[in-house]
């Protein structure tokens, strides 16, 4: 049995899985937060999105639509994370696979966690958002 096959079998055992996970965790913790974020984006969104992320961050001047400052690198605080907003007609998997074609699909913009959740709650529906905004204005008197 070849060494790589033995290693693959060993990784399937509880001890092997635990050891490999610990090694991977140490590797990512030692990485620079910026590189860690870009590597995470590449794995989640595809190889064409990290460059888009850098360009979009610069185009938005490091700010969300709500003017909150965005964090470029990785952060352990979930509420501080910069979110990638995409058109709901395309899943993350479709965007990822499109990077291997001549016509890649890119996300829409970068948002703070709060704005990303808000858009999701309103199903990316501007009319619904306007109704609620108008309602809030009316409640203020």
Language-model region placement:
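Contiguous alpha-helical segments
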Residues: 1-83, 88-106, 110-141
């Amino acid at each position: 049995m070849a060494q790589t096959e033995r290693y693959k079998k060993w990784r399937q055992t509880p001890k092997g899985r635990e050891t490999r996970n610990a090694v991977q965790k140490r590797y990512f913790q030692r990485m620079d937060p910026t590189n860690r974020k870009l590597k995470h984006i590449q794995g989640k969104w595809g190889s064409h999105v990290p460059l888009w992320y850098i360009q979009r961050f610069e185009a938005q001047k490091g700010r969300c639509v709500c003017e909150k400052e965005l964090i470029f690198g990785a952060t352990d605080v979930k509420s501080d994370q910069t979110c990638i907003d995409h058109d709901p007609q395309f899943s993350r998997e479709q965007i990822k696979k499109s990077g291997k074609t001549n016509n890649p699909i890119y996300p829409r913009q970068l948002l703070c966690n709060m704005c990303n959740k808000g858009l999701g709650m309103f199903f990316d529906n501007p009319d619904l958002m306007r109704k609620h905004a108008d309602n809030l204005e009316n409640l203020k008197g």
